[in-house]
């Protein structure tokens, strides 16, 4: 317990919450342009070829974002919308691309969880 004199000398510090998606700059989504679309492998014990894209955002950041769903139409210079949300088995991937917006197509033949993949009825 600090004394009153110690509290007068220096007040209590507020605990600042560190954001998990700094490139969004406190916005729900951000627009960006794909600079590279490629596949990468997850860390152990998983095995796959995960589709990811390197994106230059309007906020000035360059980030790696995951492309969800089966099949995509993204290529270099595609304009995409990203949201926060990491991929647990891909280190450094802290953002998701939103399907069905801007240049990103919706997932073809999707029946369940359609809203997450930009599919209309």
UniProtKB/Swiss-Prot annotation:
> Mind telling me which CDD domains this protein's record contains?
Ribosomal_S12 (cd03368)
Claim: RNA-binding is one of the keywords in the record: yes
Does the keyword section mention Ribosomal protein?
yes
Q: What is its main location?
A: plastid
Q: Name one GO biological process term.
A: translation
Q: Which cellular component appears as one GO term in the record?
A: small ribosomal subunit
Which InterPro entries does the entry link to?
Answer: NA-bd_OB-fold, Ribosomal_uS12, Ribosomal_uS12_bac
Keyword field:
Chloroplast, Plastid, Ribonucleoprotein, Ribosomal protein, RNA-binding, rRNA-binding
Report the family membership: Belongs to the universal ribosomal protein uS12 family.
**How does this chain assemble?**
Part of the 30S ribosomal subunit.
Return the protein name.
Answer: Small ribosomal subunit protein uS12c
The species is Bigelowiella natans
